[in-house]
Curated annotation (Swiss-Prot):
Protein's recorded name: Precorrin-6Y C(5,15)-methyltransferase [decarboxylating]
SUPFAM superfamilies assigned: S-adenosyl-L-methionine-dependent methyltransferases, Tetrapyrrole methylase
GO molecular function, one term: protein methyltransferase activity
Primary enzyme class: transferase
Organism (species): Mycobacterium tuberculosis (strain ATCC 25618 / H37Rv)
EC number(s) on file: 2.1.1.132
Classification lineage: Bacteria, Bacillati, Actinomycetota, Actinomycetes, Mycobacteriales
InterPro entries: 4pyrrol_Mease, 4pyrrol_Methylase_sf, 4pyrrole_Mease_sub1, CbiE, Cbl_synth_CobL, Cbl_synth_MTase_CbiT, Cobalamin_biosynth_MTase, SAM-dependent_MTases_sf
Amino acid sequence: MIIVVGIGADGMTGLSEHSRSELRRATVIYGSKRQLALLDDTVTAERWEWPTPMLPAVQGLSPDGADLHVVASGDPLLHGIGSTLIRLFGHDNVTVLPHVSAVTLACARMGWNVYDTEVISLVTAQPHTAVRRGGRAIVLSGDRSTPQALAVLLTEHGRGDSKFSVLEQLGGPAERRRDGTARAWACDPPLDVDELNVIAVRYLLDERTSWAPDEAFAHDGQITKHPIRVLTLAALAPRPGQRLWDVGAGSGAIAVQWCRSWPGCTAVAFERDERRRRNIGFNAAAFGVSVDVRGDAPDAFDDAARPSVIFLGGGVTQPGLLEACLDSLPAGGNLVANAVTVESEAALAHAYSRLGGELRRFQHYLGEPLGGFTGWRPQLPVTQWSVTKR
């Protein structure tokens, strides 16, 4: 059995009697250097510090035989090693004794409800994944440099007036809180930030809605326009944790919107044009999502993480591309393809005749001035084919 004991900045004094007894009876305890240093002299077990990288060492543990003990920060099941151990060895082989999490402590200090506060971990993720356009979050830092890195990004993307609080050594005798704005922290960061810190951010509210308008994206005209983007996302039907392949991504607007739809949604964007690939990267960073940007399809398919859903927004008439997309889909996965030319529309109609699914055609109009009046200007019709792989 692997017993995981959560410990806070207050060390042994903050632990329950059950947690203290487990540590005192242990023969071997694994943990980080900081966590192991929190144990007192009543713990006589041999102490093993995790190496870097840590995962191979974790995978080498064996829950069979004598009990193994692991110390972890706060609640080990909240972006912690407890979740990793259960995934590797099963819940029957892992017992978790949680401590109060840094998230709970930070919310208590800020006066925020935990249930409606987003939690973002930057322990291994890039800082741009914590950029938001409104709301509030507790951000778990990777190290002392994380607050400045996030503050700089928020400032660069027009969110510099976001309320920005850095809370260090939560629950311990050296606890400290510093309040300000992202801009102030980016311009004049303190030099004495503790490695053990979290960031409480109240993001500057963006005027733009969650369905971002076309002008919110960097693009050269190759973008799924807003009304069709809404219809396309409805057809793609994202669910939490799914991965999208955006093939012929253009600006990456579909990939970005997909990643913003549900927690855990990720995307891989395939685009042959280098300038457009740069736009996709810029748009992903601006919206605080992570999109894996790759080259031309289908050549770049081989080493990409497998998709749950595929959107084909360009290249419908490219020989073999539609078939390669279908081959890459798992059984039960959805493919949605849009077409605006007669040739690409014919290709989708042919695919529909062979494979079934649903074939739709959308036509929308925009009201525009016509002299002293208003007239309707038709936009290009869009044909959409969606199919579930059997």
